Curated annotation (Swiss-Prot):
The chain crosses the membrane at residues 39-59, 163-183, 204-224. It is found in: Cell inner membrane. This is Biopolymer transport protein ExbB. Disulfide bonds: none annotated. GO terms for cellular component: plasma membrane. It comes from the Bacteria. Belongs to the ExbB/TolQ family. Keywords: Cell inner membrane, Cell membrane, Membrane, Protein transport, Transmembrane, Transmembrane helix, Transport. The lineage of its organism: Bacteria, Pseudomonadati, Pseudomonadota, Gammaproteobacteria, Lysobacterales. The accessory proteins ExbB and ExbD seem to form a complex with TonB. It comes from Xanthomonas campestris pv. campestris (strain ATCC 33913 / DSM 3586 / NCPPB 528 / LMG 568 / P 25). It is a multi-pass membrane protein. GO terms for biological process: protein import. Involved in the TonB-dependent energy-dependent transport of various receptor-bound substrates. Protects ExbD from proteolytic degradation and functionally stabilizes TonB.
Amino acid sequence: MLQEFVIAAAAGGSNPSAALSQMGFEHLITEMTSSPGDFAVSWVVLITLIAMSAASWYWTVINIFRATRLKSAADRVTTAFWDAPNAQDAIRAMEEQPASEPFSKIALDAAQAAAHHQRAEGSTGGMGESLSRSEFVDRALRQAVTRESTKLQSGMTLLATVGATAPFVGLLGTVWGIYGALIKIGATGSASIDAVAGPVGEALIMTAIGLFVAIPAVFAFNFFSKVNSSVIAKFDTFAHDLHDFFATGSRVR
């Protein structure tokens, strides 16, 4: 269809250079601002894409800081736990960690479960009779790992949604721009570049913006998916070692 526009424009003898100067982003914004009612759909598309881009970059930055913090904290916290001479000192070391630190929270949950089960062992009909110490600690660790793993997924759904839908939002602007070009041709009776350059330029720009929003979101989603998988594997390994320590008293380090 665009090829037909160019052929018709050449036959009409219009000035392509002047027409193509109307296809820039600055010209599009000027037209949208001067007559917002005529560009209602374009405004909706543009604002939606800007909001999607802002949200995806926000969660990208948040995940970068979180991944950096977890990478430095993983070995530090686990080493602090296993280097403690006894369980009391290990628990105290975990309590000194920041409240948002996941490895220390997993260790504290395991310690609390073991202590709670020990207190209940002497009670009649308590959980000490229904669940063994190993089972009780294992359940607490599973819940802790699941909780902390879920927190790692914050923003991931949004990144996936932006990466999957932003091109189609931009495509909506493309379709609407070409539709506007056809309406303009019907109203003026001219298929010259002068008549269609603005709407077609708008269409192409909206497509480019949609891709510009989607591509970083897709890269971020794939990168953080890999990072989160690595962190979750460390959660599982630490939880397994904690289970052996609190359930049987054996140290892995």
